[in-house]
Amino acid sequence: DRLRSRGLGDVYKRQAVGDYKKIPNEVGGMDTALPEEVADKMKTLLTEYNGKEEKNFEDILDFHVKFERIHPFQDGNGRVGRLIMFKECLKYNIVPFIIEDNLKMFYYRGLKEWDNEKGYLTDTCLTVQDKYKAYLDYFRIEY
């Protein structure tokens, strides 16, 4: 877009750091929450997630999908969302994982299709989790 080509997009992003988004954004071609909806949707998401006593792998993925669909910040939502997933896996003794660039398209498909087919995202995450487990095995770290 013209704003970014003139270098003004980055100026706006710096001003919005730490705040919820002020202008609409998108992820992987999917619509996200409008700026005026973000606070309520985030409150609902956090209340729902924190209301669960124990979280499992699917709960963490479900939270992530919902977070990404809200896309609460102007920029950095993917990194923040994936970092939250990593942290939650550690918190609940689930082997964490990192979505690498070569699997991003499968990851985005998984986000998009979550409501119809959870397997796309689940399988993508389990694949990279297996890679992480191989590193743990190599260094003889129990999990």
What kind of region is each of these model predictions?
Residues 22:
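Conserved catalytic-core motifs characterized by acidic clusters
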Residues 1-12:
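Single conserved hydrophobic/aromatic residue that forms the stacking wall/gate
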Residues 13-19:
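Proline-centered turn/helix-capping motifs that create local helix->coil transitions or kinks
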